[in-house]
Amino acid sequence: MTTSTQHKLVSLGVSLPLMEAFYTIQGEGYHKGAASYFIRIGGCDVGCHWCDVKESWNANTHPPTAVADIVTEASKYSDTVVVTGGEPLTWNMEPLTNALKDKGLQIHIETSGAYPLTGQWDWICLSPKKLKKPTTDIYPLADELKIIVYNQNDLQFAEEQAAKVSADCKLYLQPEWSKRETVMPLIVDYVMKNPQWRVSLQTHKYLNIP
């Protein structure tokens, strides 16, 4: 297959730049503790300096993989699939989610919301970033809002973002891993005073699993 053909298939969403896929325990947010199959799609231009998967940014370093092959592997594991990145909405997610739905799987997405929403999702975890704000249409669709807290200023950003989601959206504050010792007391105090928020931890890192 020629490079131009591969690029066309990726642009259509029939193939995707797959960084990795693995079966593990969801470590964050509302579904923490649940067995899930993760599909990590390469490509992201949001540019968070504290990102713990910077190797996902350049889509060209990850092989274009046919959606059919991705789904065949995913269907061997949990009934829940989490699509993450990178920023998965860089690409057309319709072919992937349609194929996963055909297998009867529950499909979650973790996204910054920086690009228009494509695909059919059972759960949308919106994690907005200051450098590239979400598109306005995703806010009312978010089931979960997860704000990464690097410093105290992020608490104000969290409230600005929470004002845009639906009343049913679950609200989470999660410490940026390298700053957890510093910001965790801030988060705990804030959640105690503002109980509409919950604390999210990267429990998979404490468990030493992917």
Where are the model-predicted features located?
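A short beta-strand-turn-helix
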Residues: 26-29
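Compositionally biased amphipathic helical and low-complexity segments enriched in hydrophobic
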Residues: 10-13, 156
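Conserved AdoMet/S-adenosylmethionine-binding subsite of the radical SAM
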Residues: 89-210
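Conserved Radical SAM active-site core
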Residues: 3, 16-23, 35-38, 42, ...
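Short amphipathic alpha-helical segments, especially helix-boundary/capping motifs
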Residues: 12-13, 44-48, 70-73, 132-135, ...
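A generic structural micro-feature
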Residues: 31-33, 139
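Polytopic alpha-helical membrane-helix bundles and their juxtamembrane interface segments
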Residues: 3-11
